[in-house]
């Protein structure tokens, strides 16, 4: 038997809007920093060729990263440096009219994956899979901050209190071995997959990474941009992933699946060993169902809960996570004998995370996310 399929059951492209928000309170002064990441088109492709009991499959997709985000008003971690400088030169008093800040930050992270694998149908109830994925990371940060003292601070009026310039590109690559199995027992379907940890180091190609205090450039010690200096390599491993799913066919037209994902985050290398601060690796629980309303139409719905095991030392303005739950809905429309169109929408609600810096300083991290997907399956 020969069969060639070009498909993506999830998406041909995705339109995504992700909003990152950081609320900061330092020295009695509150700040609100909003970053918007909008991705109007993220393509992905999958294909499979089957002959007898063997199937070879391949795909190309954006498999990770946070996309592009722009913080037009900068970040609280940089503004707090300004407030600390004002606190020092003003004798401990800080009011907004003592200084002015002009600041902005853009960041991007994309992991592109090319995957190839081979499946074998062992018997009527067992199929196995082995393959791998090549991951290529590209991203970086570009931003600036200029803070100037006002004339109501004696001696320092008009002087640059803090200056920051950052222009850094990052690249890296790594290989992910993948194993899987599929078991079919009557109306029950069990799926297992394990993705091994991917060793990934990001190398900086930096044009600027300078922090100035009172006009003097800082050295590496205590410099918040030391990790972004030219040539620095930063570990950014992709954690190993174990997934297990159990599906049941209630009716020939009605199916449901319960699924569990575990990311072994604490065993992966990350910048400044921040993974050690996590309480545990990421847990994800998913449940979904699909119903064949008619011969040409299938609808589906699902729920996902994600728990990262977060801790204060893991979170920063540049990189943070929030526990969440997602609701999704989709439909598959059979257009012809060979062509099926898939549409989907999901919305994610994130829990706010509060990080206490000191008795007078805290950051609150939050997000919102909405995604629309469109895909096609074509069987030759």
Residue ranges and their predicted role:
Residues 1-18:
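Transmembrane beta-strand segments of Gram-negative outer membrane beta-barrel proteins
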């Amino acid at each position: 038997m020969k069969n060639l399929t070009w498909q993506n059951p999830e998406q041909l492209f995705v339109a995504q809007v992700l909003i990152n928000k950081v609320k900061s309170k330092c020295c009695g002064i509150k700040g609100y920093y909003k970053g918007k990441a909008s991705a109007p088109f993220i393509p992905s492709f999958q294909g499979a060729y089957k002959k007898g009991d063997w199937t070879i499959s391949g795909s190309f997709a954006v498999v990770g990263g946070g996309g592009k985000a722009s913080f037009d008003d900068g970040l609280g971690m940089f503004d707090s440096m300004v407030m600390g400088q004002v606190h020092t030169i003003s004798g401990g008093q800080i009011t907004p009219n003592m200084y002015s800040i002009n600041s902005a930050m853009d960041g991007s992270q994309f992991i592109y994956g090319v995957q190839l694998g081979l499946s074998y149908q062992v018997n009527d109830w067992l199929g196995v899979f082995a393959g791998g994925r090549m991951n290529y990371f590209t991203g970086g940060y570009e931003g600036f901050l200029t803070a100037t003292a006002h004339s109501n601070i004696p001696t320092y009026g008009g002087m640059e209190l803090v200056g920051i310039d950052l222009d850094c590109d990052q690249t890296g690559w790594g290989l992910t071995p993948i194993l899987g199995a599929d078991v079919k027992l009557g109306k029950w379907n069990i799926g297992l997959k394990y993705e091994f940890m991917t060793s990934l180091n990001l190398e900086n190609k930096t044009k600027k990474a300078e922090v100035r205090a009172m006009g003097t450039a800082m050295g590496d010690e205590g410099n918040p941009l030391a990790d972004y200096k030219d040539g620095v390599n930063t570990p950014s491993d992709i954690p190993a992933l174990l997934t297990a799913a159990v599906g049941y066919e209630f009716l020939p037209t009605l199916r449901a699946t319960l699924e569990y994902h575990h990311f072994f985050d604490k065993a992966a290398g990350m910048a400044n060993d921040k993974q050690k601060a996590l309480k545990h690796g990421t847990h994800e629980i998913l449940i979904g169902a699909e119903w064949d309303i008619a011969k040409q139409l299938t609808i589906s719905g699902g729920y996902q809960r994600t728990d990262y095991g977060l801790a204060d030392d893991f979170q920063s303005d540049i990189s943070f996570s929030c526990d969440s739950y997602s609701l999704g809905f989709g439909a598959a429309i059979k257009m012809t004998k060979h062509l099926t169109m898939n549409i989907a929408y999901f919305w994610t609600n994130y829990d706010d995370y509060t990080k206490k810096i000191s008795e007078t300083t805290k950051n609150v991290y939050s997000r919102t996310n909405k995604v629309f997907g469109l895909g096609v399956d074509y069987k030759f």
